[in-house]
Amino acid sequence: MLCLPGQINLQIPPNVIQGTGSVVTVAKDGTVSRGPANIGNIAPAIFTRKGDGTGAPAATASKNGQVFDILVANNDGTPVALDAGNYVSLFGTGFRFLSGPATITLGGTNIIPLFVGPQGQFAGLDQINFQIPLSLAGKGDADLVITLDAKTSNLVKMKIK
């Protein structure tokens, strides 16, 4: 769990029953806050450089699919231009328990991901990997969303050379 002014990050245990519930927090001074929570297996959210769910994704890219050392976002949250054919690893949450096919839509083109699941190093962090189709060369600005079990993520921005 992480608590900051105006933000609480927590991981829901996998054995929690799905449905509507509530989250209750108690501050050091005893102040109690409550809020609704809709618990489900899939709730795809792509992390972004700005940290607010908008702009370029918190992601890395690779020319060969092996070494992911190309940043996908500038410090201000705008997208870095990537080559068509690059591999991309997006990070987020709410991906790992999908029961059906996953789709990435980038610049209006549907892409089947190469991998969807737990990132493997950090609790609750999920990842989805894909290759930018060569058909998107020269596209420029491109919107990206992922769809898992008929649920769609937040829209993020990418740029294709």
Show where each model-derived region lies.
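A sequence-level detector for low-complexity, Ser/Thr- and acidic-rich stretches
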Residues: M1-K161
